[in-house]
UniProtKB/Swiss-Prot annotation:
The active site is at S145 (charge relay system), D223 (charge relay system), H256 (charge relay system). It comes from Escherichia coli (strain K12). This is S-formylglutathione hydrolase YeiG. Its EC number is 3.1.2.12. PANTHER family: S-FORMYLGLUTATHIONE HYDROLASE (PTHR10061), S-FORMYLGLUTATHIONE HYDROLASE YEIG (PTHR10061:SF1).
């Protein structure tokens, strides 16, 4: 591992690291916020997954999460949104390829060689964080848009791994919206049954009651993508039918930007702290 940056921040440290990923077959970068030490108890971790076109720095520089994370004693880990590099397959569109990994394991050429973000987030990155930093094994997950989709599927596919999950303006039903259809067709092929494994609504309908974890979703009602790409009401209906403990908050006047995330990130951190710090 190589440290790229380090900054003092709210008595803790904001760092950026590069490492060689055996899962993704390329170098990867992640950011981490380490809160000031409180006692001898290792702090829990909140993983944050960003959206289309983003990297590990968007949340770090725009969300303003460090102050509350420092107060609560929560480590923040921000991975990149895809594998990257000259040898990594890409596309001219902003919504496919580098910066648009969709947090799944691709099965189709040319994507399958590198695009295994699901395995990276489930196994390699947490193991690296555990081995290199003083953290506990308690973790939660959150994200925005494509990253909200990522956070939800990570939680739904890995019962017991996370204490809680939250999302801002998530893509909840990718099998049925343009962003998801484009990405899944390329990464997973035309067999739509294979898509269901990566769709939060399908996963929630297939879930077991004992695996449900506290879930918080915020959605701005002035989000330009609300009607055609996001459709949180579809997941809310799945949660209602499954009696899944999910709160969906529609926030009047807010859009899809980091101004929206910055406005409510404190709520999300305090929500996760209830379960992470038990």
């Amino acid at each position: 591992m190589e440290m790229l940056e380090e900054h003092r921040c709210f008595e803790g440290w904001q760092q950026r690291w590069r490492h060689d990923s055996s899962t993704l077959n390329c170098p990867m970068t992640f950011s981490i916020f380490l809160p000031p030490p409180r006692d001898h108890t290792p702090p829990p971790v909140l993983y944050w997954l960003s959206g289309l076109t983003c990297n590990d720095e968007n949340f770090t520089t725009k969300a303003g999460a460090q102050r509350v994370a420092a107060e609560l004693g929560i480590v923040l880990v921000m991975p990149d949104t895809s594998p990257r590099g000259e040898k990594v397959a890409n596309d001219d569109g902003y919504d496919l390829g580098q910066g648009a990994g969709f947090y799944l394991n691709a099965t189709q050429p040319p994507w399958a060689t590198h695009y295994r973000m699901y395995d990276y987030l489930r196994d390699e990155l947490p193991a690296l964080v555990q081995s290199q930093f003083n953290v506990s094994d308690r973790c939660a997950i959150s994200g925005h848009s494509m990253g909200g989709h990522g956070a939800l599927i990570m939680a739904l596919k890995n019962p017991g791994k996370y204490t809680s999950v939250s999302a801002f303006a998530p893509i909840v039903n990718p099998c049925s919206v343009p962003w998801g259809i484009k990405a899944f067709s390329s990464y997973l092929g035309e067999d739509k049954n294979a898509w269901l494994e990566w769709d939060s609504c399908a996963l929630m309908y297939a879930s077991n009651a004992q695996d449900a974890i506290p879930t918080l979703i915020d959605q701005g009602d002035n989000d330009q993508f609300l009607a055609d790409q996001l459709q949180p009401a579809v997941l809310a209906e799945a949660a209602r039918q499954k009696a899944w403990p999910m709160t969906l908050r529609i926030q009047p006047g807010y859009d899809h930007s980091y101004y929206f995330i910055a406005s409510f990130i404190e709520d999300h951190l305090r929500f996760h702290a209830q379960y992470l710090l038990k």
